[in-house]
From Swiss-Prot:
PANTHER family: ZINC FINGER PROTEIN GIS (PTHR46547:SF7). A zinc finger (C2H2-type) spans 91-113. Expressed in inflorescence meristems, floral meristems and stem epidermis. Plants over-expressing GIS have delayed shoot maturation and flowering, and a strong production of trichome on the inflorescence. Residues 1-10 have a biased composition (Acidic residues). One of its GO terms (biological process) is regulation of DNA-templated transcription. It comes from Arabidopsis thaliana (Mouse-ear cress). Residues 11-21, 49-63, 76-85 have a biased composition (Polar residues). The gene is GIS. GO terms for molecular function: DNA-binding transcription factor activity; transcription cis-regulatory region binding; zinc ion binding. GO terms for cellular component: nucleus. It is found in: Nucleus. Residues 1-85 are annotated as: Disordered. This is Zinc finger protein GIS.
């Protein structure tokens, strides 16, 4: 069979000694070959299939690598943009409007502002609780050193003069012990044991009594005695007999 013309040739097969001597006969080509579907695409011829396969076929690994490279480029650009933004960003304080490079520094600074405001609120509340006191002094105890010391102020009496600002102040723990203070001892003026003398004998002026002795059992039984001495003896103190009481007090009931 001639491949070019498609005509058959007659040959003598009786004298053939081996299969290699037999001619190789091919099937004639179809004029309209059937298309071959590969990866969802139809291929009709060998040459066309090779060209279309090379043009249309894409390696999935190559596409994946290209996508990863594009993503890396995008992330790199985003990271550079974020770094530039972070370097240019400043954290501003809401209280004093100062700028800080990091959020941690801003947080510590604003915590200090909050602490200062809490202390200021406590000071204002204590000032309104004790309105007569100086706002810059310690507010829980009376300041007895603001004015001249008198016997009436020291021993709880009533004085005609102006009272100090700490006179109405009460201790924070609710006790009245903080209001009683001993005056500075003057030599020869106050006799610490005048209310407890017996048989005309008195102890030395250097001896001191407790801070607060308000015993009513130690009242003087002498009716005609000095009113000031009776009043002072009720608190455990008395004046020396040789010293006159120069404090002008109204002791009439």
């Amino acid at each position: 069979m001639d491949e070019a013309t498609g005509e058959t040739e007659t040959q003598d097969f009786m004298n053939v000694e081996s299969f290699s001597q037999l001619p190789f006969i091919r099937r004639p080509k179809d004029k309209n070959p059937k298309p071959i579907r590969v990866f969802g695409k139809d291929f009709t011829g060998r040459d066309f299939s090779i060209t279309t396969g090379q043009e249309d076929y894409t390696d999935p690994y190559q596409t994946k690598n290209k996508e990863e490279e594009e993503e890396e480029d995008q992330t790199g650009d985003n990271s550079t943009d974020n770094n530039s933004i972070s370097h240019n960003r400043r954290f501003e304080c809401h209280y004093c409007f100062r700028n800080f490079p990091t959020s941690q520094a801003l947080g510590g600074h604003q915590n200090a502002h909050k602490r200062e405001r809490q202390l200021a609120k406590r000071g204002v509340s204590s000032y309104f609780y004790h309105p007569d006191n100086n706002p810059y002094s310690y507010r829980h105890y009376p300041s007895w050193t603001n004015g001249p010391l008198t016997a009436a102020r020291s021993y709880g009496g009533f004085s005609s003069g102006p009272k100090p600002s700490g006179y109405y102040t009460r201790p924070s723990y609710g006790s009245q012990l903080g209001l009683w203070r001993l005056p500075p001892r003057v030599q020869g003026v106050y006799n610490s044991n005048a209310a407890f003398t017996s048989n005309g004998s008195s102890s030395s002026s250097n001896s001191t009594l407790p801070l607060l002795t308000r015993s009513q059992t130690q009242l003087s039984s002498q009716v005609g005695g000095s009113a000031a001495q009776n009043r002072m003896s009720s608190y455990g103190y008395g004046l020396s007999p040789n010293v006159q009481d120069h404090v002008s007090l109204d002791l009439h009931l």
